């Protein structure tokens, strides 16, 4: 006879009006994490978690879908206003920001926090296709 798994306590619903949306956009995927002001993750989603596989994860539409899913979960927690921090060179940057706005979150600030080396490690060799 199969054992039934015990269900743990559900995550408590918090009322967090303000937060920060971290959008990490690479050429292969887009990850959206929505945190409170202290940095505690409230909701997250990615293009892969939204059902896209392979090269489709890097598309703007996949980024839009991921941002909508994360925004929906954040709105359930009572979030209204967010600051947006964008990191990376991917194609889903603008679409993800637009999707957060359309979902009903008021964007107060957009900041690009892409890390730039001050002549650090040597770059990878150029691809010859």
Swiss-Prot record:
Pfam families for the chain: Ribosomal_S11 (PF00411)
PROSITE patterns from the UniProt entry: RIBOSOMAL_S11
GO molecular function: rRNA binding; structural constituent of ribosome
Record-level GO cellular component terms: ribonucleoprotein complex; ribosome
Keyword line: Ribonucleoprotein, Ribosomal protein, RNA-binding, rRNA-binding
InterPro entries associated with the record: Ribosomal_uS11, Ribosomal_uS11_bac-type, Ribosomal_uS11_CS, Ribosomal_uS11_sf
GO biological process: translation
Function of the molecule: Located on the platform of the 30S subunit, it bridges several disparate RNA helices of the 16S rRNA. Forms part of the Shine-Dalgarno cleft in the 70S ribosome.
Assembly and interaction partners: Part of the 30S ribosomal subunit. Interacts with proteins S7 and S18. Binds to IF-3.
Record-stated family: Belongs to the universal ribosomal protein uS11 family.
Name listed for the protein in its UniProt record: Small ribosomal subunit protein uS11
Record organism: Synechococcus sp. (strain RCC307)
Gene: rpsK
């Amino acid at each position: 006879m199969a054992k039934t798994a015990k269900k743990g306590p559900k995550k408590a619903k918090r009322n967090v009006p303000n937060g920060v949306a971290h959008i990490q956009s690479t050429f292969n995927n887009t990850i959206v994490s929505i945190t409170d002001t202290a940095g505690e993750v409230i909701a997250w989603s990615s293009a892969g978690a939204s059902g896209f596989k392979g090269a489709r994860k890097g598309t703007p539409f996949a980024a839009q879908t991921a941002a909508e899913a994360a925004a929906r979960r954040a709105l359930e927690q009572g979030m209204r206003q967010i600051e947006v921090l964008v990191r990376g060179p991917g194609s889903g940057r603008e679409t993800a920001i637009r999707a957060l706005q359309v979902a009903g979150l008021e964007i107060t600030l957009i900041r690009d926090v892409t890390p730039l080396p001050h002549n650090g490690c040597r770059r990878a060799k150029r691809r010859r296709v």
